[in-house]
Amino acid sequence: MTENKAENKQTEKTEKMEVNIIIISDSAGETAFNNAQAAAVQFPDAEVNYRRYPFIVNEKKLAATLEEIEQYPNLVIVYSMLDEKLQLPIIKFAREHKARYIDILSPIIEAISQTTHMKPTGLVGANHQLTNKYFNRISAMEFAVMYDDGKDPRGFLEADVVLLGVSRTSKTPLSLLLANKGLKVANLPLVPQTHIPKEIYQIDPTKIIGLTTDPQVLNRIRRQRMISYGMDPDTAYSNMDSINAELDSAMALYKKLGCFVINVAERSIEETAALIMNHLSYEED
């Protein structure tokens, strides 16, 4: 009995530490996201979750964002905001919640300003040309945020692609990545004993992507999530029998729909996105 406990403790120690990188921007947030990604790849033993909040252009949107991210543990906030009034609440929140925070733009802007003796324009998104491609991306990002987690079933009928998957199969970050490439994406979490919206059965099956993973991988991720919240890792959420049942149920639905299935285990979201774009014969402009 003692040996089993020791083995369990050792397993928990080797599980990946969860880090939630929050990207807040008054524009599309590509600069902040790319910098965060470049830094995060230096930590392969961490489970890094990217949570993007683009187009936060007023105090009301920012307040809602800060309220939402309060639920996540181990926060690293990366922000790109030109309006100082929107920077201050982020800094205050980070300090109150003992979160690390990084201002991507201000130090560079200040350095250029001091060198040139010029004042910055303060124009949001000035580095983007106002092209159809740019506006399509903005529209797609807004669409992905609006129809994340099955918030409104009507989004399934308007989407270019619909992602289905059990909890922790990278639906949201994948949606945002595809949106950044111009695709309108909606996603639906497959929760046990929950009704599937009728709209799912009305969609062209070629537009539906069923996400699955390996049971052991999902077990590890879910256990670590419980540990990061200070909870018992051995719950129904992380139980292998429950996980197998969830994955089997999801696969049965995918078979019924006749949709394209991707196993995301040990696969980066960039690789998964490439497979989806290839399946859709979609070429980024």
Curated annotation (Swiss-Prot):
<dbReference type="Pfam" id="PF03618">
    <property type="entry name" value="Kinase-PPPase"/>
</dbReference>
<dbReference type="GO" id="GO:0005524">
    <property type="term" value="F:ATP binding"/>
</dbReference>
<dbReference type="InterPro" id="IPR026565">
    <property type="entry name" value="PPDK_reg"/>
</dbReference>
<dbReference type="GO" id="GO:0043531">
    <property type="term" value="F:ADP binding"/>
</dbReference>
<keyword id="KW-0418">Kinase</keyword>
<comment type="similarity">
    <text>Belongs to the pyruvate, phosphate/water dikinase regulatory protein family. PDRP subfamily.</text>
</comment>
<comment type="function">
    <text>Bifunctional serine/threonine kinase and phosphorylase involved in the regulation of the pyruvate, phosphate dikinase (PPDK) by catalyzing its phosphorylation/dephosphorylation.</text>
</comment>
<keyword id="KW-0723">Serine/threonine-protein kinase</keyword>
<protein>
    <recommendedName>
        <fullName>Putative pyruvate, phosphate dikinase regulatory protein</fullName>
        <ecNumber>2.7.11.32</ecNumber>
        <ecNumber>2.7.4.27</ecNumber>
    </recommendedName>
</protein>
<feature type="binding site">
    <location>
        <begin position="165"/>
        <end position="172"/>
    </location>
    <ligand>
        <name>ADP</name>
    </ligand>
</feature>
<dbReference type="GO" id="GO:0016776">
    <property type="term" value="F:phosphotransferase activity, phosphate group as acceptor"/>
</dbReference>
<keyword id="KW-0547">Nucleotide-binding</keyword>
<dbReference type="InterPro" id="IPR005177">
    <property type="entry name" value="Kinase-pyrophosphorylase"/>
</dbReference>
<dbReference type="GO" id="GO:0004674">
    <property type="term" value="F:protein serine/threonine kinase activity"/>
</dbReference>
<dbReference type="InterPro" id="IPR027417">
    <property type="entry name" value="P-loop_NTPase"/>
</dbReference>
<keyword id="KW-0808">Transferase</keyword>
